[in-house]
């Protein structure tokens, strides 16, 4: 409300809120700039539909598992968001892939793997030292896998509405067949969506039924394996560990859950009141026998102890005279050991002397043989020299005449 002293002044608006006006902005701030529109052909104008964008990203969330945007310094590389041509469903979102999404994801992954293998084949040469899974073999396997995916005929079987109907393929296919039959009856001559060709009779419709018994067997085997796994986990949870000290746990390591339940039921039935009196009487008799056995065992143990003590005493008595002579025997053994060592050394010296004597004898024989040869050679040379001197004397005599 306005101040009461201004209530009677002319030009005052009554029963209205107070308005406080400010002065205009400076001239520099009052300038208005017209935004120029970009008319260049190099700039691409994108028309954004907010409603379509909202519907596309509705109920979507960004997975931050394993991401690190911190500025810490370390050897490990920081991991940020990664995106590709085809975005898969993230883990932990609580959304299950539909068969159509699985089919598209498998086709996309096979295509990427095929591209990578083609790049490897152009750079890597085949050799005998390669690994078992060569790029050529891997490419063949990829082609077979892609052919198997294409052979599933998912798109042909369910049409463009597969993304909706593939959550229940059998039900969707049955509904589509019924709709086509109704349309055929109404049109009388129209062909169904699954006809392989135009039949001779326009009132007939031919359908192809693609049966995959291997897939059915695999699904059945997977269900059986899952059931066996759950049953094994249940048996493991119910089964108790074997304890040798606890007689109640004896025999509870059964092969299956039924055997364990039967054993537990038998043990529980043994605790009935009608049976406990009989069990108590038997336990009393067994306890008396156990006490008698304990007394007898104590007497037997005492007798065994006394016999062992007597044996030890006799052994000590026999050992006393031997113990007195043991130091002398040890001294003699030490002396004999030294004598044996000296005798061994003397034997080695004799062996060396004998070997040296044999070497000297062999040398003497060789020298004798050489001396004989030298003497023979000297005699021959002396005879030759004497003959030469005689011939020289004869020549001198002849020359003197």
Curated annotation (Swiss-Prot):
Keywords: Acetylation, Coiled coil, Cytoplasm, Cytoskeleton, Dynein, Membrane, Microtubule, Phosphoprotein. InterPro entries: Dynamitin. It is a peripheral membrane protein. Pfam families: Dynamitin. Residues 1-25 are annotated as: Disordered. GO terms for biological process: melanosome transport; mitotic metaphase chromosome alignment; mitotic spindle organization; protein localization to centrosome. Subunit of dynactin, a multiprotein complex part of a tripartite complex with dynein and a adapter, such as BICDL1, BICD2 or HOOK3. The dynactin complex is built around ACTR1A/ACTB filament and consists of an actin-related filament composed of a shoulder domain, a pointed end and a barbed end. Its length is defined by its flexible shoulder domain. The soulder is composed of 2 DCTN1 subunits, 4 DCTN2 and 2 DCTN3. The 4 DCNT2 (via N-terminus) bind the ACTR1A filament and act as molecular rulers to determine the length. This is Dynactin subunit 2. The gene is DCTN2.
